[in-house]
UniProtKB/Swiss-Prot annotation:
Annotated gene: MOS4
Protein name: Pre-mRNA-splicing factor SPF27 homolog
Summary of subunit composition and partner proteins: Component of the multiprotein assembly MOS4-associated complex (MAC) at least composed of MOS4, CDC5 and PRL1. Interacts with CYCL1-1 and CDC5. Associated with the spliceosome. Interacts with ENY2.
Organism: Arabidopsis thaliana (Mouse-ear cress)
Any Pfam family hit: BCAS2
Single GO BP term: defense response to bacterium
Length: 253
């Protein structure tokens, strides 16, 4: 059955080949008509449906806790044998306190040891080392000044980028929600328009079931009568098979 423009109704169309999350050979197909199935409001039917759903969930291979099982496994991290954390593990096992970071020594001028105070080469070496340290501190001060001067503007620009990104994500989420709502409206429309045909077919099926039961009952009565006639004929000594062979078949008018 198709519409006037040739579109096939959703419930009657052949399902398209979708790309499942996991292409399992025993993937379960779940079908439902939530927009036209109103029998769930009946308490008796509701209890029976709940029982069937619970039974199906017990037999189902798709358990709620197994949804992530279809995804690739996470990489294994061996934190226990990590060389970076090895010393910390040893310190914790030994019950030692964490090593205190000495910030004061970074800002102190180093001097040659006492036994090299009269060595010009040692003084030149430590002088160069202190000059490099001083140059590093000057660079750090310049970076702090730049951060103090330009940092607020950079934060504002970063916040603006985050706001633009948030707006874009919200727009995409809204578009997806609109697509979901569109699909739900189409499903509702197709289910409601197809419900008339389904109801007619259900009514026809029930009538055929009643007719079949009536035919089956009539056939059972005829079989009982035939058995009764055969029994009566046997008691009277009649050979029904011989008599039936001599009867000419009825001609169709």
């Amino acid at each position: 059955m198709a519409t006037n423009n040739g579109d096939v109704l959703m419930l009657e169309a052949t399902p398209e080949a979708a790309r499942p999350w996991a292409s399992a050979a025993n993937a379960e197909v779940i079908d439902a008509l939530p927009y036209i199935d109103d029998d769930y409001g009946n308490p008796l039917i509701k209890s029976e449906v709940d029982r069937l759903v619970e039974e199906e969930m017990r037999r189902s291979s798709k358990k709620p806790a197994d949804f992530l099982k279809d995804l690739p496994p996470l990489p294994k991290f061996d934190f226990k044998n990590c060389p970076v954390l090895g010393k910390e593990y040893e310190r914790v096992r030994a019950g030692k306190p964490p090593v205190r970071i000495d910030f004061e020594s970074r800002y102190k001028l180093e001097m040659p040891p006492a036994n090299k105070r009269n060595d010009d080469a040692a003084w030149k070496q430590y002088l160069q080392k202190n000059q490099r340290s001083l140059q590093q501190k000057l660079i750090e001060l310049e970076n702090l000044e730049l951060m103090s001067k330009l940092g607020p503007e950079l934060w504002r620009q970063n916040n603006h980028r985050l706001e633009v990104f948030l707006t874009r994500m919200q727009r995409l989420a809204q578009e997806q929600n609109e697509e979901i709502e569109k699909v739900n409206r189409e499903r509702k429309y197709h289910q409601q328009t197809t419900s008339y045909e389904l109801n007619a077919l259900s009514q026809e099926w029930r009538q055929l079931c009643v007719k079949n039961m009536e035919i089956q009952s009539a056939c059972a009565m005829l079989e009982t009568q035939i058995d009764s006639f055969k029994k009566e004929a046997a008691e009277r000594g009649w050979n029904l098979e011989e008599k039936l062979e001599n009867v000419e078949p009825l001609q169709m008018q």
